[in-house]
């Protein structure tokens, strides 16, 4: 799922979305993640996704891929070594990878998580705090976790052109992140009106159906996305 630069000056940024195919039907995470969480398989699933992305991705420094990871994955003391080993077996540059941590998940060992993030960032990996603003953990995580991006929760973004409250929240979150040197990404952008407001607010990246719908990673084509963005700009 692509995140496009609102001011058209940043590199292309894509988020990997996980789907499970069963009898020709694509199942959304809401169908298979709860059982994985219940039986303790989420970390294993995260590692499988990382391995697959690292295997398929080639060096292109103008491309940044976001991979969602769970709090239990980040808590795991062996995660850092796993990433390094997987990296050595791939053609990936660390600068191409951004690990996304949802605010909605619990990071039990915050000190260990911070240490892991710092070590991986030193190598060039980047980190994003997802669903920013969705709960009470927002500002605590922003203070404690050394991230490069925050993704503003789509519930605030979706109708910001029709809601003064949403507009105020998005503007405040954007200013807070910017003041800390963190790049903002707006989720759930579904109309030109919302996109226009985000550009005025100076939000760096936008993600949503207005810009592009998710597609299989096998047909990732940067020129196609650039053409579509041009159509949105002129249409």
Segments and roles (model prediction):
Residues 6, 10, 19-25, 70-77, ...:
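EAL-family c-di-GMP phosphodiesterase catalytic domain
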Residues 115:
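Mobile late-domain/C-terminal helix-loop "cap" segments
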């Amino acid at each position: 799922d692509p995140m496009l630069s609102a001011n058209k000056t940043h590199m292309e940024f894509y988020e990997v979305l996980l789907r499970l195919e069963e009898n020709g039907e694509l199942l959304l995470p809401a169908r298979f993640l709860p059982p994985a969480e219940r039986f303790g398989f989420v970390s294993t699933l995260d590692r499988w996704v990382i391995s697959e992305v690292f295997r398929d991705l080639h060096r292109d420094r103008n491309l940044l891929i976001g991979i969602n990871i769970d709090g239990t994955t980040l808590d795991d003391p062996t995660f850092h070594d796993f990433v390094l080993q997987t990296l050595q077996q791939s053609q990936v540059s660390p600068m191409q990878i951004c690990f996304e941590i949802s605010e909605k998940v619990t990071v039990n060992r915050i000190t260990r998580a911070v240490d892991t993030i710092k070590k991986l960032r030193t190598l060039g990996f980047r980190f994003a705090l997802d669903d920013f603003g969705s709960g009470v953990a927002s500002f605590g995580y922003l203070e404690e976790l050394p991230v490069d991006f925050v993704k503003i929760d789509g519930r605030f973004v979706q109708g910001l052109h029709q809601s003064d409250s949403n507009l105020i929240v998005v503007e405040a979150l954007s200013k807070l992140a910017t003041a800390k040197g963190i790049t903002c990404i707006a989720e759930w952008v579904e109309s030109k009106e919302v996109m226009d407001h985000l550009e005025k607010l100076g939000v760096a990246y936008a993600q949503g159906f207005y810009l592009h719908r998710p597609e299989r990673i096998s047909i990732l084509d940067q020129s196609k996305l650039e053409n579509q963005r041009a159509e949105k700009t002129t249409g």
